[in-house]
Regions:
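Tryptophan (W) side chains
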Residues: 2-4
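Compositionally biased, intrinsically disordered low-complexity regions enriched in proline and serine
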Residues: 13-14, 84, 101, 159
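Compact soluble domain cores
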Residues: 24-112
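Functional cores of ribonucleases/endoribonucleases
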Residues: 93-140
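Enriched for short, Lys/Arg-rich terminal
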Residues: 133-159
Length: 159
């Protein structure tokens, strides 16, 4: 059966299926307690007097495969919202467990901390936020996504 399917599907279709399966394996719903602990630690780092937004917070404005005219990039979302790093930090401090979506393994480095995904409503639009604490000891936060959601999200495990 697999041989027939492989003969019928194009290489592109196979790649898409493989990516989808890999993504499904990398997703999980963390317990309510785990999400609460993550949010407490995130807020603790941000509220620490030693936290320096320019040294301790990184954001990926544009991924390699994104085009400049893509409305769903972090860079273009920030422009449309008239946001800077301080606004992102403010929104991270305001995250609630009810806005949690899922937890993802960092596929580029499975041994690094996981990404935590949230959807926050800003100016009547859903904003997709994917963030991790890179290092608790060094107090580093990495936000890989802060952009308008490409699709409406309605599945909030604790919302």
């Amino acid at each position: 059966l697999w041989e027939m399917a492989i003969n019928i599907l194009t290489n592109y279709q196979l790649i898409v299926i493989i990516i989808m399966v890999m993504q499904m394996e990398n997703k999980q719903i963390s317990s309510k307690e785990q999400v609460e602990n993550f949010l407490l630690e995130l807020k603790h780092i941000i509220n620490d007097k030693k936290f320096n937004i320019n040294e301790d917070f990184d954001i990926l404005l544009k991924k390699k495969n994104e085009t400049d005219d893509d409305a769903y990039t972090t860079k273009n979302t920030l422009i449309q919202l008239n946001y800077d790093k301080n606004d992102i930090i403010r929104n991270l401090k305001e995250l609630k467990i009810s806005e949690y979506i899922e937890t993802l393994t960092d596929v580029k480095n499975v041994y690094s901390p996981q990404f935590w995904v949230f959807i926050k409503r800003i100016n009547l639009k859903q904003v997709y936020i994917k963030v991790k604490i890179r290092s608790i000891q060094n107090r580093k936060i990495f936000c890989i996504s802060f952009h308008f959601a490409r699709f409406q999200v309605n599945n909030f495990p604790y919302g």
